[in-house]
From Swiss-Prot:
Source organism: Arabidopsis thaliana
The reaction(s) this protein catalyses: S-ubiquitinyl-[E2 ubiquitin-conjugating enzyme]-L-cysteine + [acceptor protein]-L-lysine = [E2 ubiquitin-conjugating enzyme]-L-cysteine + N(6)-ubiquitinyl-[acceptor protein]-L-lysine
Region described as Disordered: 277-341, 356-402
One cellular component term from this protein's GO annotations in UniProt: cytoplasm
Keywords carried by this UniProt record: ANK repeat, Metal-binding, Repeat, Transferase, Ubl conjugation pathway, Zinc, Zinc-finger
Record-linked Pfam families: Ank, Ank_2, zf-C3HC4_3
Composition-biased stretches (Polar residues): 304-317
Pathway(s) the chain acts in: Protein modification; protein ubiquitination
Protein name: Putative E3 ubiquitin-protein ligase XBAT35
ANK repeat ranges, renumbered to this chain: 6-35, 39-69, 75-104
Amino acid sequence: MGQQQSKGELLYQQVSYGNSEGIRALHRDGGDLEWMDREGKTPLILACMNSELFDVAKTLIELGSNVNAYRPGRHAGTPLHHAAKRGLENTVKLLLSHGANPLVLNDDCQTPLEVARVKGFSNVVRAIEKHICLFSGWMREFYGPTFLDLFAPQLLSRRVWVVIVPTGSRNPTKPFKLELVVYASLQDAQPRTVMPLWKANLEEPKAKQSDTSVMIVDNSTIPSRRMKKRRVCASHGRRRPQVVRQTRLKFAPSTEGDSQQLKWFCDACKGIPQPMHPPVFLQAPPSAPPPPSEDGLAMGMNASLHTTMSDPSNLNHHSIGQASSSSGPSSSTAPPSGKASAFGFNSHGIGIVLESSPSAPPLTDDDIATVDDGPIHYPSIDSTPVDLPSAASLPASTEGERKEDGNTGTCAICLDAPSEAVCVPCGHVAGCMSCLKEIKSKNWGCPVCRAKIDQVIKLYRV
């Protein structure tokens, strides 16, 4: 007699039959939703490969199937990869609405968005970009020789669809890299231009100028072999200034004089999403711990407040994120006096913006002029050696406490998940995303200072 089939295999077979009721019955009897065939396909992956199995895919997701189940091998990946490859727009939207990660790379180093572009499914490309973009909209792109812009700028511009999206990465703990994508029309799946923003500089229009355009310069260097030869020649002879090949893109708002759209575009290039339409993947962590009970929240808040009162230095520390210097020059403007805008961002990823009350004396007119005209000077780092106590001499009670800088501590409420969310507007990094959202929904206030929480933002550390 042949080997008896498992309930998971029977459930897998019911997917190909389109039998949703049979799937529910087998799941109640213990059928495994993550059973894999010889090719590594789960029931959900199989359902996402056929447009006629949309209801089956919806049933599997409702029963708890893993929307990010990974199938190794060429032309494989997550359920979202398979749906994007076949142009199943409704299935793609279903997966995205239930937490599918659109930035996962398959074994071919492609995200679902890149798979849809290669296959030419513009509807799927628009659906994924709408879900993850920091900016999207019609703009005017200037082309042709630069000197002709002075004489006939309108004749040398064309209307293009511009999107700023994060790229995929093998390491989800690193900040996301951003790229600028330009399409000739909404019907195009393949972009006309793709520029990596972590290798580019943004030249914003100055406030006193009437020119409402922005230029992005790609400072990608010459290939490594030629650069190596140049360095060898420079070391043996007289040094010459190296000329770097540049790619320039110049944009203006689709409606002349629309400074608000231009500001949103410039902010998105720096990693700041639009305030009214932030990307969905920035609003919640991909895998959040279960919400704690009300008693646990209350105990955690009391313990956090007690710790803060005993250590007043924590009250004045607003940890927003670590910033790193860019490899090339960047243009920055000082925030208006009266409010300090803190922005944790480096040239390789997405930062978080939050406004807080000023913690330093206001800038004078001379200081503001210096900031506008010259580079920003950051405080120097004290490299004086510090005597630290050994691990054996530390008291045992400090093992589970949060570090003073708040960067690597755990949640002060559930004491389980990492402290990865910030309260707005007070700026305290007080806990994990799940706990702080629960506190905000109950209007309990910040666990550190009891201030009202207007928004909870997830931090992406460098």
